[in-house]
Amino acid sequence: MPQLVPFYFTNQIFYGFASLSVIVYLFSIYILPHYLEIYVTRIFITKT
C-alpha cells in the first residue's frame, strides 16, 4: 500500500492540499453564490 510508505507522504500531502484548494475555489466561485441567491430570495419572499 503506497499510503503507508513514507516516500509518498509529501506527494500525497501536496496533491491533497492542491485538490482541496481547487474544490474550495470552485465552490466559492460557482456553487455557493447560486445557493446564496436562492436563500436570499426565499428570505425576501417570506418577509413580505
Curated annotation (Swiss-Prot):
Task: State which ranges are Mitochondrial intermembrane (membrane side).
Answer: 1-12
User: Can you say where in the cell this protein is located?
Assistant: Mitochondrion inner membrane
List of residues that carry N-formylmethionine: M1
The cross-references to InterPro entries, in alphabetical order and at most eight, read:
ATP_synth_su8_fun
Q: Which GO terms describe its cellular component?
A: mitochondrial inner membrane; proton-transporting ATP synthase complex
Q: Name one GO biological process term.
A: proton motive force-driven ATP synthesis
What is this entry's stated membrane topology?
Single-pass membrane protein
Q: What GO molecular function terms would the record report?
A: proton transmembrane transporter activity
* Residues exposed to the Mitochondrial matrix side: 33-48
**Which residue spans traverse the membrane?**
13-32
The UniProt keyword set, sorted, is: ATP synthesis, CF(0), Formylation, Hydrogen ion transport, Ion transport, Membrane, Mitochondrion, Mitochondrion inner membrane, Transmembrane, Transmembrane helix, Transport
Q: How does it assemble?
A: F-type ATP synthases have 2 components, the catalytic core F(1) and the membrane-embedded component F(0), linked together by a central stalk and a peripheral stalk. The central stalk, also called rotor shaft, is often seen as part of F(1). The peripheral stalk is seen as part of F(0). F(0) contains the membrane channel next to the rotor. F-type ATP synthases form dimers but each monomer functions independently in ATP generation.
**Briefly, what is this protein's role?**
Mitochondrial membrane ATP synthase (F(1)F(0) ATP synthase or Complex V) produces ATP from ADP in the presence of a proton gradient across the membrane which is generated by electron transport complexes of the respiratory chain. F-type ATP synthases consist of two structural domains, F(1) - containing the extramembraneous catalytic core, and F(0) - containing the membrane proton channel, linked together by a central stalk and a peripheral stalk.
The cross-references to PANTHER family, in alphabetical order and at most eight, read: ATP SYNTHASE PROTEIN 8 (PTHR36101:SF1)
The entry sums up its family as follows: Belongs to the ATPase protein 8 family.
Q: State what protein this is by name.
A: ATP synthase protein 8
